[in-house]
Amino acid sequence: MKKAKLNGHKVTIYDSIDELPMVRFHKYSKMLLVDAGVGSDINDFDAHLERATRFIRKGDNENGAKELENLRQCVYLILQEQSVRDLSFACLVAEIDGKPTDDLSEQGLCEVCKMLGGTPRVDFTKELDEVKKKIDSELTTYFPDLFDDAGAREYYDTMKRRTVAVLENIIEGETEARDRMIESMTEMMVLYVKPKTFAGRQSVEIQHDKEYESMCLTISRETHADAKKMTVMEYYNAYEYIRRMAKERQKLGSKRKTA
């Protein structure tokens, strides 16, 4: 686990899937899901506005309406003055000054954020980014079939090509063809991820929780172990084991039918 000094407190942070409890990772993932889809600061407000405008201009009113609904929720979170991204970091805080921080309710996470609230934003962001990068790296290394995102690679390839085109415009001077290409790639990047619903019964938060509970039941039934007491490493190892066994059973079933 990682040690850090934040707002005068000695903080212990989970930074490895070997130790990170799955219940914390689930909550952490859900907070990042909300942060990515709704956000809670003025930059997120501006991003929603731009995306809604672009969707509507393209005639995609359904996604435009979803963006406006997410914009409304973003405004609510801004007024609450609580960053969802900060709450995701709070999920990874194991101890503050030697005392365990086991309350993963929203109130408990807010209390952690309050205790660390005097930390300069740059330091807070640095700690979260470092821990997130390490966890993401371990997940893609150990479970590439589950976490290696080909779509993300395509997105970053487009971003790289756009950056090169912008630099060429600066060095060689603007051309109409290059301007059109830059605008096309900008629109592709801005609209790359379709907006999700974060309100009502179809909320992705509700679906996220239901899928997790369903998978915990499956793992517990198949392995006779409590999935909610597993680390992230143990949980996804169990998931892959169950998936392999299901494929083998399916193959055996197919062979019996053809025999």
Model regions: which residues?
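An amphipathic, hydrophobic-aromatic interaction surface with interspersed Lys/Arg
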Residues: 1-259
